[in-house]
């Protein structure tokens, strides 16, 4: 028997990837597409490549008969929308940032709004599947992690958990394709602005910073403050992070490989690459995999960690479906058994 799901925000890039994945999921029926601006428009008119003959509607959510609702909506939307009564009717996976951070003051500092739903904020489960699998299985509200956050945390988590690095020395240099900025029209995302160009942005201000720090703090069992610098590169999709940290001990690469293997050997979507094989965005494009590898610089006594994901799949829609699979006791990789098409 298939579960019935709905999507609010299916017209965006992440929403479209959700539709694409769910149409090929054997245990899911897409029953509702919600929109306030495209009511009556058929989804195929918006995305002719997508075989979904369903029109956008704008119903009161309490009227819907769904097992699960995905929210691929702008920040602040779901924080005002969700309530306990709705969560008694259906499960929710929120792809926005509205329930990712536990400290309400972080929303005032980083997102510039006062969170209106602090009780639900505390009850939401952070949907990083490789770290919080058991909590996700029991959750009614899952906060899907950010794209930079997913790649950064997965790449560094074992080092923080084992406390083998100087936490104050950590620097994350991140690069993302243009789809990470969303589908809405912006001058800075026009072809002539981004083509043949790389630029840094939001220096010391990127909103994924507190998310990364919060969950690496849980791993380290102490408050973490780190440096995160994102860059926009002229490609459609993909994230590559390069992270640097000082080692506290004289460790060899095999020592660190043993640590990563201990944490990730049973995870279906994390690929610890062989020695000397460095992650590339094209190897994870349109897939739910996270590729990770590292090198130890014996001269500087630093570990250099590289991670790559597709920002729209493992960084958004694919991870949301992975969360759904856990919440409904499906195989974790159901509907996600695809790999990069080079």
Curated annotation (Swiss-Prot):
GO terms for cellular component: cytoplasm. Its EC number is 1.2.1.38. Pfam families: Semialdhyde_dh, Semialdhyde_dhC_1. Disulfide bonds: none annotated. It is an enzyme of class 1 (oxidoreductase). It catalyses: N-acetyl-L-glutamate 5-semialdehyde + phosphate + NADP(+) = N-acetyl-L-glutamyl 5-phosphate + NADPH + H(+). GO terms for molecular function: N-acetyl-gamma-glutamyl-phosphate reductase activity; NAD binding; NADP+ binding. Keywords: Amino-acid biosynthesis, Arginine biosynthesis, Cytoplasm, NADP, Oxidoreductase. It is found in: Cytoplasm. One of its GO terms (biological process) is L-arginine biosynthetic process. It comes from Campylobacter jejuni (strain RM1221). Belongs to the NAGSA dehydrogenase family. Type 1 subfamily. It comes from the Bacteria. This is N-acetyl-gamma-glutamyl-phosphate reductase. Pathway: Amino-acid biosynthesis; L-arginine biosynthesis; N(2)-acetyl-L-ornithine from L-glutamate: step 3/4. InterPro entries: AGPR_AS (IPR023013), AGPR_type-1 (IPR000706), NAD(P)-bd_dom_sf (IPR036291), NAGSA_dehydrogenase (IPR050085), Semialdehyde_DH_NAD-bd (IPR000534). The active site is at 147. Catalyzes the NADPH-dependent reduction of N-acetyl-5-glutamyl phosphate to yield N-acetyl-L-glutamate 5-semialdehyde. Its main location: cytoplasm. PROSITE patterns: ARGC.
């Amino acid at each position: 028997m298939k579960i019935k799901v709905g999507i609010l925000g299916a017209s965006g890039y992440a929403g479209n990837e959700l539709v694409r994945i769910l149409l090929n999921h054997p245990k899911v029926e897409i029953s509702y597409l919600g929109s306030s601006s495209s009511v009556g428009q058929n989804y195929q008119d918006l995305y002719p490549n997508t075989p979904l003959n369903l029109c956008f509607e704008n119903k009161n959510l309490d009227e819907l008969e769904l097992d699960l609702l995905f929210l691929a909506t702008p920040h602040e939307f779901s924080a005002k929308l969700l309530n306990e009564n709705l969560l008694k009717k259906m499960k929710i996976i929120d792809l926005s940032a509205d329930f990712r951070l536990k400290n309400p003051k972080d929303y005032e500092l980083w997102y510039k709004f006062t969170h209106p739903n602090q009780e639900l904020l505390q009850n939401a489960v952070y949907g990083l599947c490789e770290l919080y699998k058991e909590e996700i299985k029991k959750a009614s509200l899952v906060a899907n992690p950010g794209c930079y956050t997913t790649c950064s945390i997965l790449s560094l988590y074992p080092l923080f958990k084992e406390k083998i690095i100087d936490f104050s020395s950590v620097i994350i240099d991140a690069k993302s394709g243009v789809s990470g900025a969303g589908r809405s029209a912006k001058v800075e995302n026009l072809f002539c602005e981004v083509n043949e160009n790389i630029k840094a942005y939001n220096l010391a201000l990127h909103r994924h910073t507190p998310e990364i720090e919060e969950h690496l703090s849980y791993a380290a069992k102490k408050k973490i403050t780190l440096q995160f610098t994102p860059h926009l590169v002229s490609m459609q999709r993909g994230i590559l992070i390069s992270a640097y940290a000082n080692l506290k001990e004289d460790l060899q690469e095999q020592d660190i490989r043993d640590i990563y293997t201990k944490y990730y050997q049973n995870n279906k979507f994390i690929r610890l690459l062989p020695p000397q094989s460095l992650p590339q965005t094209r190897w994870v494009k349109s897939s739910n995999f996270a590729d990770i590898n590292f090198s130890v610089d014996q001269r500087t006594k630093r570990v250099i960690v590289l991670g790559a994901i597709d920002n729209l799949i493992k960084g958004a829609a694919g991870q949301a479906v992975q969360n759904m699979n856990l919440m409904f006791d499906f195989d974790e990789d159901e509907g996600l058994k695809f790999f990069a098409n080079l």
